[in-house]
């Protein structure tokens, strides 16, 4: 019996080590299965349901490829009364996409609501009208309200 034990121990050790890897399977996600557009749409759904933190997480994921996601994040912060954060995000949206008329309009509206930077707000509203004349009625409303407040 004593002579068999030294030979049996290495065999048992090999079996134990090789079976340990099989006993605990690991799931490794190499990349995000959702596209940026899907993250944006999921964020919109969360936002509509009032789940703002989840919406922000999804917009943040979408922002890697879609600059418009910064606009959406700004809108969430605006709705929650976090105007300084909304302002930063609207500016970031404009920085990333200078042709985003909605970002200019929303920043103009934010300044209107805060009652500050009204000259700049007017310029932003005019820029929105220039960039997207098809939404002139929306942007014109912003512009008129700003001019009334000045």
Describe each region flagged by the PLM.
Residues 31, 62-65, 96, 130-131:
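Structural marker of alpha-solenoid helical repeat scaffolds
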Residues 36, 67-71, 101-102, 136-137:
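Helix-start (N-cap) detector for alpha-helical repeat units in TPR-like alpha-solenoids
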Residues 41, 72, 106, 141-142:
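Canonical tetratricopeptide repeat
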Residues 40, 47, 78, 112-113:
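Position-specific recognition of the canonical hydrophobic site in helix A of tetratricopeptide repeat
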Residues 49, 80, 114-115, 150:
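Structural motif corresponding to the intra-repeat A-B loop/turn of tetratricopeptide repeats
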Residues 44, 75, 109-110, 145:
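Residue-level recognition of tetratricopeptide repeat
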């Amino acid at each position: 019996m004593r002579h068999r034990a030294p030979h049996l121990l290495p065999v048992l050790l090999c079996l134990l080590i090789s079976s340990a890897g099989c006993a605990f399977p690991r799931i490794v996600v190499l990349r995000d299965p959702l596209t940026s557009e899907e993250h944006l749409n999921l964020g919109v759904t969360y936002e509509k349901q009032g789940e703002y933190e989840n919406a922000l997480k999804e917009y943040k994921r979408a922002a890697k490829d879609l600059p418009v996601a910064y606009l959406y994040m700004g809108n969430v912060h605006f709705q929650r009364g976090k105007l300084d954060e909304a302002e930063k995000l609207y500016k970031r949206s404009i920085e990333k996409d200078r042709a985003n008329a909605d970002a200019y309009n929303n920043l103009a509206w934010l300044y209107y609501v805060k009652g500050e930077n009204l000259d700049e707000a007017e310029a932003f509203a005019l820029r929105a009208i220039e960039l997207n004349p098809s939404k002139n009625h929306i942007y014109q409303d912003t512009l008129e309200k700003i001019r009334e407040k000045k």
